From Swiss-Prot:
Belongs to the peptidase M67B family. Metalloprotease that displays desampylase (DSAMP) activity, cleaving ubiquitin-like small archaeal modifier proteins (SAMP1, SAMP2 and SAMP3) from protein conjugates (isopeptide- and linear-linked). Thus, likely regulates sampylation and the pools of 'free' SAMP available for protein modification. Functions as a specific and not a general protease since it is unable to hydrolyze a variety of unmodified proteins otherwise hydrolyzed by proteinase K. One of its GO terms (molecular function) is metalloexopeptidase activity. The lineage of its organism: Archaea, Methanobacteriati, Methanobacteriota, Stenosarchaea group, Halobacteria. Its cofactor is Zn(2+). Optimum temperature is 40-50 degrees Celsius. Is active over a wide range of temperature (20-60 degrees Celsius). However, the enzyme is not active at 70 degrees Celsius. Is optimally active at NaCl concentrations of 0.7-2 M, and displays little to no activity at low concentrations of salt (150 mM NaCl). Inhibited by EDTA and N-ethylmaleimide (NEM) in vitro. It catalyses: an N(6)-[small archaeal modifier protein]-[protein]-L-lysine + H2O = a [protein]-L-lysine + a [small archaeal modifier protein]. This is Desampylase. GO terms for biological process: proteolysis.
């Protein structure tokens, strides 16, 4: 992946934000997460697939449920699409990579989209050493 831009389908954006708002409305608020599907070469996201957050501290961290993630990745591949990356929310902080996000990032070349319940979102490619910010275009 070489583009510095992520194209995000409006339906996928709406799904991600709805999921983030559900997590933020919890008591206590919790980060939500999921898998982004589409065309990895074009860096285009056409669908967002929610995955349960199984982190020990879901208010400040996320961990994709491994079994759900494998099932979703298989379904994406079966549909002829690619896993473009992952999304998660920051219900009580800005949508930028946290120290925890940096420590736990483990998929070089994939997109990590972070959103807040107020609709702000950022996207970053994990290089294996750092996050490289991407512009986000909703289409």
């Amino acid at each position: 992946m070489t583009s510095s831009r992520l194209s995000l389908a409006a339906d996928a954006r709406d799904s991600i934000l709805s999921h983030a708002r559900e997590g933020a409305a919890g008591d206590p608020p919790a980060e939500v997460c999921g898998v982004l599907a589409g065309d990895s070469d074009a860096r285009t996201v056409t669908a967002a697939h929610p995955v349960s957050n199984v982190a020990a501290e879901p208010r400040v961290a996320y961990e994709l449920d491994p079994e759900e993630t494998v099932s979703i990745l298989e379904a994406i591949e079966s549909a002829g699409d690619d896993a473009v990356g992952f999304y998660h929310s920051h219900p009580e902080s800005d949508p930028v990579p946290s120290a925890t996000d940096r420590e736990r990032a483990s998929w070089p070349g994939y997109v990590y989209l972070i959103c807040s319940p107020d609709g702000r979102m950022t996207a970053h490619e994990w290089t294996g050493d750092e996050f490289r910010e991407l512009s986000v275009a909703v289409e």
